[in-house]
């Protein structure tokens, strides 16, 4: 029962942070091949996800992104790293299955995805989402 209370308390804090934290656009230049020429502010909230048989985890990435689409894969790249990153390190580089909430220029989208992968190299963080279905 105490563990359930702790999880509920942490979830409430996570929701509070996700509502009030929105990044500012720092006018980062995107590389050629991106859909946008300058980085655009975004929040990507992974509301419910799982890896194989592990328990569900949650997290959020927020900052200015460059985006690209290759086939059915949409990639959001934070060129200078996300301003907010509450994604557990155990999710980096592993396939994530579940739902996300995408707040793109304050237009909220609920998305399902078959898989997503978060990658990180030095200060650059990317999330690749395959087969996005908008609700």
From Swiss-Prot:
Entry GO terms, CC:
membrane
Bilayer-crossing residues are 59-79
Which ranges sit in the Cytoplasmic compartment? 80-135
Extracellular topological domain residue ranges:
27-58
Residues with attached carbohydrate: 36
The compartments listed are: Membrane
Give the top-rank taxon of the lineage listed in the UniProt record for this protein. Eukaryota
**Record key words, sorted:** Glycoprotein, Membrane, Signal, Transmembrane, Transmembrane helix
Q: How does it sit in the membrane?
A: Single-pass type I membrane protein
State the signal peptide span: 1-26
Q: What is this protein called?
A: Putative uncharacterized protein DDB_G0280341
């Amino acid at each position: 029962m105490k563990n359930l209370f702790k999880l509920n308390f942490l979830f409430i804090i996570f929701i509070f942070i996700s509502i009030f934290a929105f990044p500012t656009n720092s006018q980062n230049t995107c590389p050629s091949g991106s859909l946008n020429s300058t980085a655009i502010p975004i929040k990507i909230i992974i509301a419910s996800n799982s890896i194989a048989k592990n328990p569900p985890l949650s997290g959020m990435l927020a900052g200015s992104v460059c985006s690209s689409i290759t086939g059915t894969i949409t990639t959001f790249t934070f060129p200078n790293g996300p301003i907010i990153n509450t994604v557990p390190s155990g999710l980096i580089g592993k396939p994530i299955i579940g739902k996300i909430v995408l707040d793109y220029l304050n237009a909220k989208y609920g998305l399902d995805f078959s898989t997503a992968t978060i990658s990180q190299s030095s200060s650059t963080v990317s999330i690749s989402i395959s087969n996005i279905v908008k609700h």
